[in-house]
Amino acid sequence: MVDERARETIFMWYSLFNLPHRESVAGVHDRVVTPDYTSCTGDGPTDCWDKQRSIQVITGFETSIPDMKFEIKERFACDDHVIVRGEVSGTPAGSLFGGLIPHTGKRFRVMATDIHTIEGGKIRKTYHMENWFAAMLQLRA
């Protein structure tokens, strides 16, 4: 059952995406995710990364999308899962995804959906989906 501590964990997790941070990314990870945390975009063997890679990816947003914001639109809890529908927005400081999305100076706004598994009040696993195709269309328009 998801409790109040888990709700606080979820809100603290999303504070990581509202840059700039007041706390270190690694420090927040230590407080809100389990040591064996995984972040996944699918079920394939290369679709997940561990806690250290998550720290690297999120830290990278400080320079790649310095004004990034994540707004929680809806949050649902069931048993040991929390589902979040949110909106990610920002203005890339340069190209994204290895140059796939060139720098245009434009801002994007896309929907994101995350499914978090909670264990002991911390996030053990996240499945996430961001609509990066919509971002690409907005940035290239």
Language-model segment annotations:
Residues M1-A141:
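C-terminal and inter-domain tail/linker signature
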